[in-house]
């Protein structure tokens, strides 16, 4: 088992792992690192090294998220990132046991996205001034989003070929 390292050094190595081994997007990596940073701040306040964490510590952290008014879906995402981090620590032989293994996420319930009606979409597209290059670009963007059912992040990652 590897010796205790500075949490910032561990976080840097974890970032490389997420990008190279897991092939996650920059946005996802940033979200994971922000979530782990929240945990690290909690652990620092409690004077606990990330390698010394117990399930009780993680449950207390989870309760703090709830007390801060963070929505269950966001809590679940944060806890998922923490589980991924501790899985990484096991893989890299920093830890022998995973303290997050039995950590439960809050119930998130079924959330259906709100969608625009056909009339609303038509009104939106027709309101664009097509006499400018920007207007033509914006109409193309909206029609692509709508017709393909893309998220904005997916649209931004499209490559011309």
Would you name each region that the model predicts?
Residues 1-161:
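Conserved catalytic core of the tyrosine transesterase superfamily
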């Amino acid at each position: 088992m590897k010796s205790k390292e500075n949490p910032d050094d561990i976080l840097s190595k974890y970032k490389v792992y997420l990008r190279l081994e897991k092939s996650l997007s920059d946005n996802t990596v940033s979200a994971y690192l922000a979530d782990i940073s929240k945990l690290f701040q909690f652990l620092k306040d409690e004077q606990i090294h990330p390698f010394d964490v117990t399930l009780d510590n993680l449950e207390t952290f989870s309760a703090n998220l709830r007390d801060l008014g963070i929505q269950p879906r966001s809590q679940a995402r944060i806890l998922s990132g923490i589980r991924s981090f501790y899985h990484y620590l096991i893989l890299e032989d920093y830890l022998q046991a995973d303290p997050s293994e039995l950590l439960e996420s809050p119930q998130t319930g079924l959330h259906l996205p709100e969608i625009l009606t056909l009339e609303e979409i038509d009104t939106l597209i027709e309101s664009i001034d097509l006499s400018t290059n920007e207007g033509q670009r914006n109409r193309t963007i909206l029609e692509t989003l709508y017709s393909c059912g893309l998220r904005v992040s997916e649209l931004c990652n499209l490559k011309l070929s």
